[in-house]
Structure formats: C-alpha cells, structure tokens
C-alpha cells in the first residue's frame, strides 16, 4: 500500500473515531436517565461534572485529527469552539428529552472540559514536534 493511501486511511479512521465519540456523547446526553445503582451514583456526584472529561476528550480528539496546515493555535481554537458548540447544542436538546433538563452548569463544564482537552492536545503536539526535531 502506498504511503499516501495509508495516510488517507489513517485520517479517515481518525475522523471515524471522532464521529463515533460524538455519537456516544449524544447518546449519553439524550437518553432517558433511569434509576439504576450506577445512575443514582452519578446523580450523587453530579451529572455536570461528567461533562469535563467528556468534552475534554472531544476537543482533544478534534485537535489531533485536524489538518496541521496553518497555525497550531488556530487548530486548537477551532477544536475548542467545535467541542463547546456541540456540548451546548446537546445541552439545549435536553430540554425536549424526558428525565433531562437544560443546565447552565452543564454549559460551563462543557466549555471548561473543551478548553482543557484542546490545551492538553496542544501541549502534546508541541512536545511531539520538539521530540521529532531533536531526533532528526
């Protein structure tokens, strides 16, 4: 398999992972919340706190799979905005979902998680670039 074809498959697979993860977030955000022991434990902690790692993961994935043309900062900003907007869209969609409700705290944790994930991915990219320069 040629190098360019292998790169295309890798990129396609990466975007499939982002789409699958976004679908998982939508499912978890919009499904009915039941009364199982796990769900009662989640309620005890507070559902909004789960937004932090969820949207950190989405923003991190987006940062890593976006094309590297242009400034890294732009890539991080776009990933942050996209993950935050997606979280806010799902938060607004919860208005119509039974057993769910719109929550301002959820909006704040979506944005905070997206910022943390995009920043962590940015640091990873910078360190990886420095390491590859030293190795060359």
Listing of model-derived features with the role each one plays in the protein:
Residues 17-29, 75-95:
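Small-polar-interrupted transmembrane alpha-helices in polytopic inner-membrane proteins
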Residues 13-16, 23, 77, 119, ...:
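Alpha-helical hydrophobic membrane-insertion segments
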Residues 12-13, 45, 71-80, 103-104:
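Membrane-helix interface segments
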Residues 1-65:
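"…centered on the first transmembrane helix and the immediately adjacent amphipathic helix/loop
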